[in-house]
A protein has these predicted regions:
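Phenylalanine-focused residue identity feature
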Residues: 6-7, 34-35, 54, 109, ...
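Histidine-centered active-site/metal-ligand motif
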Residues: 98
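Conserved active-site-adjacent core of cysteine acyl-enzyme catalytic domains
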Residues: 26, 39-94, 103-112, 117-124
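Active-site nucleophile-adjacent alpha helix/oxyanion-hole segment immediately C-terminal to the catalytic cysteine
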Residues: 1-48
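Short, structured beta-strand segments at or near domain termini in extracellular proteins/domains
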Residues: 121-133
């Protein structure tokens, strides 16, 4: 994997991976921590750089970011973020999708400053995340 391949893939489609990393690291995560976790995950084939940073193993990705915790992930279709304690949620709009991290029914992390999918779209599916000691 070339470094430019990595950056191109990360720029195009790492939103779900970044949500998992943010969930594992918490609200004080630094850009350097995001980069380090994403790079390590790519090196270990936990994310697939050839498929726009597709997450192959969410739990392994969060373990790379923060190995001191225990994680579980449950996939479900949703139509709203209300009631979601912690989860990555996919919004869809006009044929495009974007993932954000939701805590207590509110978006707490969005890797894009301005996402049309989130602004105009609807919640379609979620990855409910549980974190333990």
């Amino acid at each position: 994997m070339g470094i430019q391949d990595f950056f191109k893939s990360a720029g195009e489609g790492s939103c779900l991976a970044l949500c998992y990393i943010r969930a594992a690291l918490g609200k004080d995560a630094t850009p350097q921590q995001f980069f380090d976790a994403l790079w390590k995950a790519a090196e270990r084939n936990i994310i697939n750089v050839k498929k726009e940073c597709f997450v192959e193993d969410a739990i392994a990705l969060m373990k790379v970011a923060n190995p001191t915790k225990v994680y579980s992930v449950i996939k479900k279709d949703v139509s709203s973020i209300a009631g979601i304690k912690l989860g990555a949620v996919r919004y869809s709009y006009n044929g495009y999708s974007h993932w954000v991290l939701v805590e207590d029914g509110k978006i707490v992390f969005n890797s894009l400053e301005n996402s049309q999918c989130v602004k105009y779209g609807t919640a379609k599916e979620a990855r409910f995340i549980t974190i333990g000691e």
